[in-house]
UniProtKB/Swiss-Prot annotation:
Annotated catalytic residues: P2 (schiff-base intermediate with dna), E3 (proton donor), K58 (proton donor), R260 (proton donor)
Catalytic activity: Hydrolysis of DNA containing ring-opened 7-methylguanine residues, releasing 2,6-diamino-4-hydroxy-5-(N-methyl)formamidopyrimidine; 2'-deoxyribonucleotide-(2'-deoxyribose 5'-phosphate)-2'-deoxyribonucleotide-DNA = a 3'-end 2'-deoxyribonucleotide-(2,3-dehydro-2,3-deoxyribose 5'-phosphate)-DNA + a 5'-end 5'-phospho-2'-deoxyribonucleoside-DNA + H(+)
Subunit and partners: Monomer.
Organism: Pseudomonas paraeruginosa (strain DSM 24068 / PA7) (Pseudomonas aeruginosa (strain PA7))
Regions crossing the membrane: none
FPG-type zinc finger span: 236-270
Designated name of the protein: Formamidopyrimidine-DNA glycosylase
Cited SUPFAM superfamilies: Glucocorticoid receptor-like (DNA-binding domain) (SSF57716), N-terminal domain of MutM-like DNA repair proteins (SSF81624), S13-like H2TH domain (SSF46946)
C-alpha cells in the first residue's frame, strides 16, 4: 500500500504539470472503486482550473476553482502523467485531460482507492479527525508520550493510529521502531518520554529520507513520472523476517501484530 512518502512523491511529481492547468474533460472507465466515483465528476471538473495539489495524510487534494478532488491510492493505485489520447490498458480507470495535452491517469488493479468530490475537503468525514502531519512542528515526541499514558496496546499499532499521527504505515513504523531501538510489542504506555522523543525524531528522519528516495516500491507503486521508488534498498527490518540484522547479525523475527506482519530484531530492539 502506498504510504505517506509514496503519496508525497506522487504529489511532487504531478503538481508542476497540474497547477494552473485547465481541465478539458474527465474520462471515467470504471466507477467502482472503494467508494463509487461521482457520476457528475466530469461536469463538476471540466472547464475548471487546477489551483493547487496538496496532500493530507495519504490523501491527495486536487484543488479546483469550485471544489476539490480527494484521491486515495488504496492498496495498489497510482497517478501518473501521460499524453492525452494514450490508449488505456486494463486497470487504468480514469483520465483527467488537461489543456496542455497531458492527462493525469489513475491506475488501480485492486480498485480499493477513491476519487471523491468535496466543497470543503478538510471537513470531509475522511479527513476531519486526522492527527498532525509527522513532518511538521505539530508532531513531536511529547505528543506521543502524552497520548500513550494508560494505553496497553502495543507501540507499533499506536504510532500507526491516524488520530495520533498520520501517514506512519507498516513500512515506516517498522523502520522507525528499529532505528529507535524499541520492541514493537512493547505496551505504548510503558515507554518513557525520552524514548518517545527519540522515536518521533526517527519517524521524521526516515520519512524525509524515503521521500528523497522516491518512496518504497515493493509491488505496484510508481511515482507521478512512472518511475519506482528506491527506499526499499535501505530497509533494515520490513519484509526481512528470518534474515540477519544488518546491525548486530541476529536473526530477525517476524510476528503478527495488530493483524499485520511485523519484523524486529530481538537484540537491537528492547
Amino acid at each position: 500500500m502506498p504510504e505517506l512518502p509514496e503519496v508525497e512523491t506522487t504529489r511532487r511529481g504531478i503538481a508542476p504539470y497540474l497547477e494552473g492547468q485547465r481541465v478539458e474533460r474527465v474520462i471515467v472507465r470504471e466507477r467502482r472503486l472503494r467508494w463509487p466515483i461521482p457520476e457528475d465528476l466530469d461536469v463538476r471538473l471540466s472547464g475548471q482550473r487546477i489551483v493547487s495539489v496538496e496532500r493530507r495524510a495519504k490523501y491527495l487534494l486536487l484543488g479546483a476553482e469550485a471544489g476539490t478532488l480527494i484521491s486515495h491510492l488504496g492498496m495498489s493505485g497510482s497517478l501518473r502523467l501521460v499524453e492525452s489520447g494514450t490508449p488505456a490498458s486494463r486497470h487504468e480507470h480514469v483520465d483527467i485531460e488537461l489543456a496542455s495535452g497531458m492527462s493525469l491517469r489513475y491506475t488501480d488493479p485492486r480498485r480499493f482507492g477513491a476519487m471523491l468530490w468535496s466543497l470543503a475537503p478538510l471537513e470531509h468525514e475522511l479527513l476531519r479527525n486526522l492527527g498532525p502531519e509527522p513532518l511538521t512542528d505539530a508532531f513531536a515526541g511529547q505528543r506521543l508520550f502524552e497520548l500513550s499514558r494508560g494505553r496497553s496496546m502495543a507501540v507499533k499499532p499506536f504510532i500507526m493510529d491516524n488520530a495520533v499521527v498520520v501517514g506512519v504505515g507498516n513500512i515506516y513504523a517498522s523502520e522507525a521502531l528499529f532505528a529507535a531501538g524499541i520492541d514493537p510489542r512493547k505496551p505504548a504506555g510503558s515507554i518513557s518520554k525520552a524514548r518517545y522523543l527519540r522515536l518521533a525524531e526517527e519517524i521524521k528522519r526516515i520519512l524525509a529520507i524515503a521521500i528523497e528516495r522516491g518512496g518504497t516500491t515493493l509491488r505496484d507503486f510508481v511515482g507521478g513520472d512512472g518511475q519506482p521508488g528506491y527506499f526499499q534498498q535501505e530497509l533494515f527490518v520490513y519484509g526481512r523476517g528470518g534474515e540477519f540484522c544488518k546491525v548486530c547479525g541476529s536473526t530477525l523475527r517476524e510476528i503478527r501484530l495488530g493483524q499485520r506482519a511485523s519484523v524486529y530484531c530481538p537484540r537491537c530492539q528492547r
